[in-house]
Amino acid sequence: MQSVQCFGKKGNATAVAHCKVGKGLIKVNGAPLSLVQPEILRMKVYEPILVAGADKFAGVDIRVRVSGGGHVSQIYAIRQAISKAIVAYYQKFVDEHSKAELKKALITYDRTLLVADPRRMEPKKFGGHGARARQQKSYR
Protein backbone atom coordinates (compact mmCIF):
# COMPACT_ATOMS: atom_id res chain seq x y z
CA MET A 1 0.00 0.00 0.00
CA GLN A 2 1.59 3.25 -1.13
CA SER A 3 0.73 5.97 1.37
CA VAL A 4 2.28 8.95 3.14
CA GLN A 5 1.14 10.94 6.16
CA CYS A 6 1.92 14.64 6.57
CA PHE A 7 0.75 17.41 8.86
CA GLY A 8 0.20 21.14 8.54
CA LYS A 9 0.02 23.65 11.37
CA LYS A 10 -1.10 27.24 11.82
CA GLY A 11 -1.65 28.76 15.24
CA ASN A 12 -3.34 26.07 17.33
CA ALA A 13 -4.83 24.22 14.36
CA THR A 14 -3.32 20.92 13.24
CA ALA A 15 -4.26 19.08 10.04
CA VAL A 16 -3.06 15.55 9.28
CA ALA A 17 -3.22 14.40 5.65
CA HIS A 18 -3.09 10.76 4.49
CA CYS A 19 -2.15 10.50 0.83
CA LYS A 20 -2.53 7.16 -1.00
CA VAL A 21 -3.13 5.75 -4.48
CA GLY A 22 -6.68 6.43 -5.60
CA LYS A 23 -8.86 8.29 -8.05
CA GLY A 24 -8.48 11.95 -7.09
CA LEU A 25 -10.67 12.26 -3.99
CA ILE A 26 -9.80 14.92 -1.42
CA LYS A 27 -11.79 14.86 1.81
CA VAL A 28 -11.61 17.06 4.91
CA ASN A 29 -12.99 15.46 8.09
CA GLY A 30 -14.93 13.02 5.89
CA ALA A 31 -16.58 15.72 3.75
CA PRO A 32 -15.53 16.64 0.18
CA LEU A 33 -13.40 19.75 -0.41
CA SER A 34 -16.35 21.58 -1.99
CA LEU A 35 -18.13 21.68 1.39
CA VAL A 36 -15.31 23.38 3.32
CA GLN A 37 -16.61 26.29 5.41
CA PRO A 38 -16.36 29.30 5.44
CA GLU A 39 -17.10 29.65 1.72
CA ILE A 40 -14.91 32.77 1.30
CA LEU A 41 -11.82 30.79 2.32
CA ARG A 42 -12.65 27.72 0.21
CA MET A 43 -10.41 28.92 -2.64
CA LYS A 44 -7.48 28.98 -0.18
CA VAL A 45 -7.86 25.20 0.17
CA TYR A 46 -8.00 24.79 -3.63
CA GLU A 47 -4.74 26.76 -4.10
CA PRO A 48 -2.31 23.79 -3.93
CA ILE A 49 -4.45 21.95 -6.52
CA LEU A 50 -4.64 24.97 -8.84
CA VAL A 51 -0.92 25.78 -8.54
CA ALA A 52 0.35 22.20 -8.95
CA GLY A 53 -2.26 21.27 -11.55
CA ALA A 54 -5.23 18.94 -11.10
CA ASP A 55 -3.44 16.21 -13.11
CA LYS A 56 -0.96 15.77 -10.23
CA PHE A 57 -3.84 14.94 -7.86
CA ALA A 58 -5.69 12.66 -10.31
CA GLY A 59 -4.02 9.41 -9.16
CA VAL A 60 -4.13 10.02 -5.41
CA ASP A 61 -6.70 10.14 -2.63
CA ILE A 62 -6.08 12.57 0.23
CA ARG A 63 -7.95 12.38 3.54
CA VAL A 64 -7.40 15.28 5.96
CA ARG A 65 -8.29 15.38 9.67
CA VAL A 66 -8.19 18.86 11.21
CA SER A 67 -8.65 19.97 14.82
CA GLY A 68 -7.93 22.94 17.07
CA GLY A 69 -7.67 26.64 16.27
CA GLY A 70 -10.25 28.79 14.50
CA HIS A 71 -11.74 28.74 11.00
CA VAL A 72 -8.94 30.64 9.25
CA SER A 73 -6.06 28.79 10.93
CA GLN A 74 -7.74 25.45 10.12
CA ILE A 75 -7.97 26.44 6.43
CA TYR A 76 -4.26 27.33 6.36
CA ALA A 77 -3.37 24.09 8.18
CA ILE A 78 -5.41 22.06 5.65
CA ARG A 79 -3.76 23.65 2.59
CA GLN A 80 -0.31 23.13 4.11
CA ALA A 81 -1.05 19.46 4.92
CA ILE A 82 -2.32 18.82 1.37
CA SER A 83 0.75 20.48 -0.19
CA LYS A 84 3.22 18.64 2.02
CA ALA A 85 1.45 15.31 1.45
CA ILE A 86 1.53 15.55 -2.35
CA VAL A 87 5.23 16.55 -2.32
CA ALA A 88 6.08 13.66 0.05
CA TYR A 89 4.08 11.25 -2.12
CA TYR A 90 5.92 12.34 -5.25
CA GLN A 91 9.28 12.01 -3.47
CA LYS A 92 8.52 8.51 -2.19
CA PHE A 93 6.64 6.89 -5.07
CA VAL A 94 7.24 9.02 -8.19
CA ASP A 95 10.54 10.45 -9.46
CA GLU A 96 12.71 13.08 -7.77
CA HIS A 97 12.57 15.47 -10.74
CA SER A 98 8.78 15.91 -10.72
CA LYS A 99 8.91 16.30 -6.92
CA ALA A 100 11.45 19.15 -7.24
CA GLU A 101 9.33 20.77 -9.96
CA LEU A 102 6.20 20.53 -7.79
CA LYS A 103 7.97 21.90 -4.73
CA LYS A 104 9.41 24.82 -6.72
CA ALA A 105 5.97 25.73 -8.12
CA LEU A 106 4.35 25.66 -4.66
CA ILE A 107 7.10 27.68 -2.95
CA THR A 108 7.17 30.32 -5.70
CA TYR A 109 3.43 30.80 -5.31
CA ASP A 110 3.29 30.89 -1.50
CA ARG A 111 5.99 29.73 0.92
CA THR A 112 3.47 28.94 3.70
CA LEU A 113 2.14 26.07 1.55
CA LEU A 114 5.18 24.03 2.60
CA VAL A 115 6.81 25.94 5.47
CA ALA A 116 4.99 26.36 8.79
CA ASP A 117 4.39 29.82 10.25
CA PRO A 118 6.31 29.93 13.56
CA ARG A 119 4.27 32.79 15.08
CA ARG A 120 2.31 31.91 18.20
CA MET A 121 -0.03 33.91 20.41
CA GLU A 122 1.69 35.61 23.33
CA PRO A 123 -0.09 35.11 26.67
CA LYS A 124 -1.82 38.06 28.33
CA LYS A 125 -0.15 39.49 31.45
CA PHE A 126 -1.68 41.33 34.40
CA GLY A 127 -1.81 45.12 34.55
CA GLY A 128 -3.15 45.55 31.04
CA HIS A 129 -5.61 44.50 28.36
CA GLY A 130 -3.26 42.30 26.33
CA ALA A 131 0.22 40.81 26.15
CA ARG A 132 1.99 44.18 25.84
CA ALA A 133 -0.69 46.88 26.26
CA ARG A 134 -0.75 48.48 29.72
CA GLN A 135 -3.54 50.36 31.47
CA GLN A 136 -3.31 54.13 31.16
CA LYS A 137 -1.58 55.89 34.04
CA SER A 138 -2.41 59.36 35.35
CA TYR A 139 0.17 61.49 37.18
CA ARG A 140 -2.19 64.13 38.59
From Swiss-Prot:
Query: Additional comments on file?
Result: There are 2 genes for uS9 in S.pombe.
Q: What's the subunit arrangement here?
A: Component of the small ribosomal subunit (SSU). Mature yeast ribosomes consist of a small (40S) and a large (60S) subunit. The 40S small subunit contains 1 molecule of ribosomal RNA (18S rRNA) and at least 33 different proteins. The large 60S subunit contains 3 rRNA molecules (25S, 5.8S and 5S rRNA) and at least 46 different proteins.
Q: Which PANTHER family match?
A: RIBOSOMAL PROTEIN S16, RIBOSOMAL PROTEIN S9
Key word Magnesium present: no
Membrane-crossing residue ranges in chain numbering: none
List this protein's GO terms for biological process.
cytoplasmic translation; maturation of SSU-rRNA from tricistronic rRNA transcript (SSU-rRNA, 5.8S rRNA, LSU-rRNA)
The family database entries (NCBIfam families) matched by this protein are listed as: PRK00474.1
Say what the protein does: Component of the ribosome, a large ribonucleoprotein complex responsible for the synthesis of proteins in the cell. The small ribosomal subunit (SSU) binds messenger RNAs (mRNAs) and translates the encoded message by selecting cognate aminoacyl-transfer RNA (tRNA) molecules. The large subunit (LSU) contains the ribosomal catalytic site termed the peptidyl transferase center (PTC), which catalyzes the formation of peptide bonds, thereby polymerizing the amino acids delivered by tRNAs into a polypeptide chain.
Keyword list (alphabetical) reads: Cytoplasm, Ribonucleoprotein, Ribosomal protein
Q: Which InterPro entries match?
A: Ribosomal_Su5_D2-typ_SF, Ribosomal_uS9, Ribosomal_uS9_CS, Ribsml_uS5_D2-typ_fold_subgr
Name where it's found.
Cytoplasm
Q: Write out the similarity annotation.
A: Belongs to the universal ribosomal protein uS9 family.
The record's section on Pfam families has: Ribosomal_S9
Q: Does Hydrolase appear among the keywords?
A: no
Query: What's the protein here called?
Result: Small ribosomal subunit protein uS9B
GO molecular function term, any single one:
structural constituent of ribosome
Which taxonomic lineage does the organism of this UniProt entry have? Eukaryota, Fungi, Dikarya, Ascomycota, Taphrinomycotina
Q: What is its main location?
A: cytoplasm
State any GO CC term: cytosol
Database matches in PROSITE patterns: RIBOSOMAL_S9
